Amino acid sequence: MKILSPLTVCLAVLLSAGCADSLKSDYQPPEVKYPANWYQADAAEERMPFDWQAFNDPDLDGWLRQVMVRNNDVAGAVLRVYGARLEEERIGITNDPGLKGSLALDGKKQLNSSAHWTRGSVASINTSYELDLWGKIARQRDAKAWARFASEEDLRSARLTLLSNASNNYWRLGFINQQLSVLQQSIDYAKETLRLANARYAAGGASSLDVVDAQQGVLSQENRLAALKNERLQALNQQAVLLGTAPGSAIVEPKALPMGPLPQVSGKIPVNVLRHRPDISAKEWRVREALATVDVQRTAFYPAFSLTGSLGTSSSSLIAFLENPVGSVGANLTLPFLEWRERGMDVKIARNDYEQRVLEFKQELYKAMSSIEDALALRHQLLEQETLLREGLELAKKSERLNEVRYRQGAVRISFWLDAQEKRRQAELALYENRFNQLNNLAKIYMEFGGSASFP
């Protein structure tokens, strides 16, 4: 083993800094085109289209907090982040100076003589450290750091998706319970209509067909009620899945949809909105990780240079070792470029993986732009639809009243009145469905804009 002078070691360290920079690739974000209606915003400008607290629903906020704590998907994402941090720490430990020690004691005695026992000892301490001449270790650390950042963004994305799913479950239960309430009222109304039809038939003022039509109306509403009760049970089971528990223990069940003012959405879209989306950020960090991996494979062409040191002795007494140790410093040189074909293939494979991730990242950007535009367009459509549905509901109520009067006067058969009841009921349910869709659309918009650090 060759002994190194301090000057040689210093020169090696200086050489390491220069060579490492020359083999480090600079990350350049891929060029993308943004929609013409998106504007360039300042970094400090608020990017969220509305504040989540504008829903003004404490029960919803409490439900979301419970889900965030107990959901298994989020718990799994937390563990993956922890695993990525451990991988990053392991790279640092692996490349720290290694230290090994050994101590051996032995005794000898000739069996055919009366000589005393001869005791001996061998002790040594060895250390080794690989000089990062080409930046290989630094790029390995970078790759693990980028992977950890991507895992952290995956956690944010999991929480944001859970926010949307849990909100949808909450509003879905409210929507179902509201439909149940409407249908129960309709059943009571249909039974009253049947009673009236029976009375008119008994008095000779109506035919038996009116009675049959009224009976069919009652059965139809009761059948819908049974189907809705099953939907409610499914929604409650989904709630248990979100909470990571067994079905059968409902935590929150709104009796109706919130009918108060909804959050106002800003139609302005800043260009930097995509930078705050966790799914986009995770994709970009993985692109950077792949680029760092390319650099690691490129450095494999260059020789690895490690410093070694040892301290030890061999004597008939351990005390002698402690009093007179022998130390040495040396260097080991490995030449991986002798396997140049295999190394070249590793670089090409890493480069191919990097280019794939770049394309996936660009595609994810364009998909995100489209999703944002679709969500905002749907918001505009739902608002227009709400206005038309309210007008339609008023007309349906008016038609129902007129047909009831005409039936009581004997001007029309009961089927006209029953049809008018059904149209009024469908118009009322359509308006509630529009409110349900608006709530889900708002959660979708909130998620498409990347959420915020303060969401429940």
What does each model-identified segment do?
Residues 76-91, 158, 162-185, 189-199, ...:
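Amphipathic alpha-helical coiled-coil segments
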Residues 16-18:
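C-terminal motif of bacterial Sec signal peptides marking the signal peptidase cleavage site
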Residues 60-62, 120-122, 168, 213, ...:
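Transmembrane beta-barrel architecture of outer-membrane proteins
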Residues 95-118, 128-157, 179, 281, ...:
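Small/polar (Gly/Ser/Thr/Ala-rich) solvent-exposed segments
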Residues 1-8:
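Bacterial N-terminal signal peptides that target proteins for export
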Residues 207, 226-274, 413, 440-456:
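Short, solvent-exposed, mixed-charge loop/turn linkers that connect secondary-structure elements
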Residues 64, 122-126, 170, 270, ...:
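Membrane-embedded beta-strand positions in outer-membrane beta-barrel channels/transporters
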Residues 20-89, 258-287, 336-337, 365:
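Bacterial Sec-pathway N-terminal export signals of envelope proteins
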